[in-house]
């Protein structure tokens, strides 16, 4: 037991992150099912809108901070990056340990905040004055703020660790453009986290002081401005959505490269520059979340055009994935299915994002279900599809076992139908101007809402099926005999790898024939 509590091994800590993420994911999914059951027909089921809004808030926090980030950055980052770089472990193993162990208490505090009344029914954005003491007079929002602080500290420590690992523990003679795409994506994600999280910490600390110490940062009666909070929050919030998707881009790139049988992804260097471009542009478009707060027309014009420009590097990535698949004979195995599903659905989410980047259109669509449909296409079918496809793809590496291929294909089809049936109708609801975060609606919206709720039940069944498939493989212990057609360093290990895969950092030597030889020195 102490092996897990005090471990400084990147593989053990990666497994802990994955377990926490799975647990939080089940919790967050349960909350989304409660939301969809409430909305499956007109009329009230929960009969208390404060509780409904609390469920919406908790669903968002759980999925973002305790499911996607621990899975992609903590889980896969810890597990795969040292193996892909050929390094013995992370740069700061003990810091790695504490950056995980800050997450369970943070999760506990988030769940504890729901036990007070009024519970935090603010939405994940926690806008004042709704989150101020006047409208949430219990300690609930304070607990949520402390939870955010702890997970933020955890993320910053994990990011520093990953950055130093990628910069200092790669092969000594390797150039940066030779580092594979997943370490690159996590490196850029770490930069985004380190630059954006302190701004969030400042914003929620000011909110904490407004609530408890009678300051008025966000209170107009004392000369403050609630719009200041929105600017600070979204300066973190927009890079955050790229933090959620960029590691997924890196993982999907590896899967596409491996499954197409190519030695490298199409336009490897362009892919790196595209991710750098996305990371940079992500910081200068935050006010597109605020088109309705009364921005100046020139400001709206700037944020509209800057947001549209983000589509360019994203399009480069999508077409490079498709170009990598071009010309190879596709046998539709499970990794290819998931990667193609990711590319297709993420692209749909990107196109609805282009629609919303127009400030004139966004004035109409802001805070409707069109926005919910958009960001669930890029998160629930971008980030989550990246997580599931990567988990299935690297499961034989992590455990040395095989999943049941036929069942996985059935599960993929169920999931694909379920998520599309859930979120595609929400665009229609948004165009019919159904607002977000409301527990009841006129019966003119009944048809699409009932279809959406049916889709969420299909998705739930597919996730239960996936858990069953994983448990079945762990119980039956089918070992993997042959591994082939892999272009990445991590597959050169035993399956599962030893606790310490590399005892020292390898050296890459290029001889006169320009063939690379990997030797230990």
From Swiss-Prot:
The keyword Oxidoreductase does not apply. GO terms for biological process: electron transport coupled proton transport; mitochondrial electron transport, cytochrome c to oxygen. GO terms for cellular component: mitochondrial inner membrane; respiratory chain complex IV. Keywords: Calcium, Copper, Electron transport, Heme, Iron, Magnesium, Membrane, Metal-binding, Mitochondrion, Mitochondrion inner membrane, Respiratory chain, Translocase, Transmembrane, Transmembrane helix, Transport. There is a cross-link at residues 238-242 (1'-histidyl-3'-tyrosine (His-Tyr)). Its main location: mitochondrion. Fe(II)-heme a binds at residues 59, 376. It is found in: Mitochondrion inner membrane. CDD domains: Cyt_c_Oxidase_I. It catalyses: 4 Fe(II)-[cytochrome c] + O2 + 8 H(+)(in) = 4 Fe(III)-[cytochrome c] + 2 H2O + 4 H(+)(out). Binds 2 heme A groups non-covalently per subunit. Binds a copper B center. Heme a3 binds at residue 374. It comes from the Eukaryota. Changing residue 270 to G: In strain: Isolate ligus8. Component of the cytochrome c oxidase, the last enzyme in the mitochondrial electron transport chain which drives oxidative phosphorylation. The respiratory chain contains 3 multisubunit complexes succinate dehydrogenase (complex II, CII), ubiquinol-cytochrome c oxidoreductase (cytochrome b-c1 complex, complex III, CIII) and cytochrome c oxidase (complex IV, CIV), that cooperate to transfer electrons derived from NADH and succinate to molecular oxygen, creating an electrochemical gradient over the inner membrane that drives transmembrane transport and the ATP synthase. Component of the cytochrome c oxidase (complex IV, CIV), a multisubunit enzyme composed of a catalytic core of 3 subunits and several supernumerary subunits. The complex exists as a monomer or a dimer and forms supercomplexes (SCs) in the inner mitochondrial membrane with ubiquinol-cytochrome c oxidoreductase (cytochrome b-c1 complex, complex III, CIII). This is Cytochrome c oxidase subunit 1.
